[in-house]
């Protein structure tokens, strides 16, 4: 986690420097070196994973207020008094990791962590915190409150997952008899009214004609996601045949999504075990009967999720890496 610390006094600066030994990050003091509260906050809110104010909570609240957008994207914000007595997460307690950070900082300086999120205060399962620990994206953040609200009301919430989850479900959580009955679900292809948690384990296999533009690939990818219900946030990498390694459109498409892209030879793709959609035409052009499916499986080291999908001269497939979710996500439970 990339932290940024801001202090307001010499005493606060000393504490910030101490804390940065535990949770590394930049340390600044307001009023020194041209640092202003508004300027520092604007810069770090966009760049850092966590903002740590060593000073009054009111100052921190007023500083971050103009920048708050969404619990899905806002950084963690924690405030400590300059004496190191209390550590209070103010923003993104679960998804941003502010609760965990406050506890770590408190342990480093002997402070009391002041955790105010309702599930934590009541000792209940926090679905968004668990999702973060499992490397899952929350697909519909407004639905978090329905799961948490049910638990707070003493109800049992049901989950569905195609992957086995290690450990014992927390109190108030049980497996749904049918996936359609789940209150929250682990899936790459969200459908229905549940809260969907998307594992970031997907690899996109790509096949395309020479000269295919990034815009064409983007349009085809949008159609692929729509027609298969694939959540694009679950894709973290792309793969293709080495004949495409210098295709500007493909490289730009992957770069725009922040995906690393790997390229394999026809021989490497032919060696991938499994049953794939075969094409004589593709075999004649590339030396292997299928590019997108084989490339996705090879790069993922896992299994095929979505078979070949063709759209305007582009083919896509999706595979998933091995995934092992665990109910024992807290450090003291592992």
Regions found by a protein language model. Give the residues of each.
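Polybasic, low-complexity association/targeting segments
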Residues: 6-11
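C-terminal non-catalytic interaction/assembly regions of soluble proteins
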Residues: 237, 241-296, 300-306, 310-314
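Donor nucleotide-activated moiety binding/catalytic core segment of transferases
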Residues: 41
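Conserved mixed alpha/beta catalytic, RNA-binding, or beta-rich assembly cores of soluble enzyme
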Residues: 12-18, 25, 34-36, 44-99, ...
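Conserved beta-strand termini and adjacent loop/short-helix elements that scaffold enzyme active sites
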Residues: 30-33, 116-118, 264-266, 307
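Extended alpha-helical regions
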Residues: 303-334
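Extreme N-terminal starter segment of soluble prokaryotic enzymes
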Residues: 1-5
């Amino acid at each position: 986690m990339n932290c940024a610390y801001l202090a307001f006094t010499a005493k606060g600066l000393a504490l910030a420097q101490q804390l940065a030994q535990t949770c590394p990050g930049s340390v600044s003091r307001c009023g020194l070196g041209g640092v202003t509260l508004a300027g520092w906050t604007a810069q770090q809110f966009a760049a850092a994973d966590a903002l740590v104010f060593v000073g009054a909570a009111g100052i921190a609240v007023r500083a971050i207020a103009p920048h708050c957008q969404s619990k899905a994207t806002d950084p963690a914000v924690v405030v400590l008094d300059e004496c190191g007595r209390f550590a209070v997460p103010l923003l993104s307690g679960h998804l941003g990791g502010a609760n965990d950070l406050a506890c770590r900082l408190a342990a480093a300086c002997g402070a009391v962590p002041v955790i105010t999120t309702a599930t934590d205060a009541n000792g209940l399962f926090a679905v968004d915190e668990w999702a973060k620990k499992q490397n899952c994206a929350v697909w519909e953040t407004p639905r978090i409150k329905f799961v948490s609200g049910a638990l707070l009301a003493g109800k049992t919430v049901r989950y569905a997952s195609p992957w086995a989850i290690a450990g014992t479900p927390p109190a108030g959580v049980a497996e749904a008899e049918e996936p359609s009955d789940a209150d929250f679900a682990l899936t790459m292809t969200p459908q229905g009214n549940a809260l969907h948690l998307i594992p970031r384990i997907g690899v996109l296999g790509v096949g395309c004609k020479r000269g295919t533009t990034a815009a064409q690939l983007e349009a085809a990818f949008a159609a692929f996601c729509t027609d298969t219900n694939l959540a694009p946030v679950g894709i973290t990498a792309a793969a293709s045949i080495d004949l495409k390694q210098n295709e500007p459109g493909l490289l730009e498409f992957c770069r725009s999504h922040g995906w690393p892209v790997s390229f394999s030879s026809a021989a490497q793709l032919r060696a991938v075990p499994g049953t794939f959609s075969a094409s004589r035409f593709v075999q004649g052009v590339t030396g292997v009967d299928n590019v997108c499916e084989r490339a996705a499986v090879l790069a993922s080291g896992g299994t095929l999720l979505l078979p070949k999908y063709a759209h305007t001269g582009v083919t896509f497939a999706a595979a998933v890496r091995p995934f092992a979710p665990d109910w024992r996500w807290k450090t003291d439970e592992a």
